[in-house]
């Protein structure tokens, strides 16, 4: 697989070509994903739940993400690699730059931050310092205690309108990817059309430019439960490589996620 860059994702958006991405945490799975030509991988703070057995993502540290980023980069030299900025690692622009520097040195091509309009200054500071940014909107798991649980976001008109404004603001601040989690498909479509950068969805319908799944959900090995927006591809195929290929095919064809994986 040739080396994937943000320019490739931009081209695919303009061409209407959908793409898939997966979370990864170690070199072996990263290598498997690259061999199947998964273009984008994310070292997610979801590792706190799926690897460390924590109830949420809040205990994850920058050092945790950096360690797993090094592992994933070792196994996938050509994928576009995003790394999550953990809870309270970007409270100020200055702290964000320090945290991002550690993750970029570990091998990330881009960092992902959760939040809305308040992130604009931080995103600008990061991009001015050559750190590409993915802005995560909708259900932001680091805010689970504010939301009172893992709930669909943007169902009321005011919240939806604000999310569209936030996406445009953060794109204008320098974000090169927008990630939408657990939002109605109609809202995801509005945002995807409103911004010129690629939009990746998880629980946001098949209307976004790309999709992402947590690998443990995709392989049906999550310890607790299967989110509605996910799909156990391993159960359907019986083989991990075939499972990844089927996921890629269905995303590119627009058949995943289907209505049963989508919120309205």
Curated annotation (Swiss-Prot):
<feature type="binding site">
    <location>
        <begin position="45"/>
        <end position="46"/>
    </location>
    <ligand>
        <name>3-methyl-2-oxobutanoate</name>
    </ligand>
</feature>
<dbReference type="InterPro" id="IPR003700">
    <property type="entry name" value="Pantoate_hydroxy_MeTrfase"/>
</dbReference>
<comment type="subunit">
    <text>Homodecamer; pentamer of dimers.</text>
</comment>
<comment type="similarity">
    <text>Belongs to the PanB family.</text>
</comment>
<feature type="active site" description="Proton acceptor">
    <location>
        <position position="181"/>
    </location>
</feature>
<dbReference type="InterPro" id="IPR015813">
    <property type="entry name" value="Pyrv/PenolPyrv_kinase-like_dom"/>
</dbReference>
<feature type="binding site">
    <location>
        <position position="45"/>
    </location>
    <ligand>
        <name>Mg(2+)</name>
    </ligand>
</feature>
<dbReference type="Pfam" id="PF02548">
    <property type="entry name" value="Pantoate_transf"/>
</dbReference>
<dbReference type="GO" id="GO:0015940">
    <property type="term" value="P:pantothenate biosynthetic process"/>
</dbReference>
<keyword id="KW-0479">Metal-binding</keyword>
<feature type="binding site">
    <location>
        <position position="114"/>
    </location>
    <ligand>
        <name>Mg(2+)</name>
    </ligand>
</feature>
<keyword id="KW-0460">Magnesium</keyword>
<dbReference type="GO" id="GO:0003864">
    <property type="term" value="F:3-methyl-2-oxobutanoate hydroxymethyltransferase activity"/>
</dbReference>
<keyword id="KW-0566">Pantothenate biosynthesis</keyword>
<protein>
    <recommendedName>
        <fullName>3-methyl-2-oxobutanoate hydroxymethyltransferase</fullName>
        <ecNumber>2.1.2.11</ecNumber>
    </recommendedName>
</protein>
<feature type="binding site">
    <location>
        <position position="84"/>
    </location>
    <ligand>
        <name>Mg(2+)</name>
    </ligand>
</feature>
<dbReference type="GO" id="GO:0005737">
    <property type="term" value="C:cytoplasm"/>
</dbReference>
<comment type="function">
    <text>Catalyzes the reversible reaction in which hydroxymethyl group from 5,10-methylenetetrahydrofolate is transferred onto alpha-ketoisovalerate to form ketopantoate.</text>
</comment>
<dbReference type="InterPro" id="IPR040442">
    <property type="entry name" value="Pyrv_kinase-like_dom_sf"/>
</dbReference>
<keyword id="KW-0963">Cytoplasm</keyword>
<keyword id="KW-0808">Transferase</keyword>
<comment type="pathway">
    <text>Cofactor biosynthesis; (R)-pantothenate biosynthesis; (R)-pantoate from 3-methyl-2-oxobutanoate: step 1/2.</text>
</comment>
<feature type="binding site">
    <location>
        <position position="112"/>
    </location>
    <ligand>
        <name>3-methyl-2-oxobutanoate</name>
    </ligand>
</feature>
<feature type="binding site">
    <location>
        <position position="84"/>
    </location>
    <ligand>
        <name>3-methyl-2-oxobutanoate</name>
    </ligand>
</feature>
<dbReference type="GO" id="GO:0000287">
    <property type="term" value="F:magnesium ion binding"/>
</dbReference>
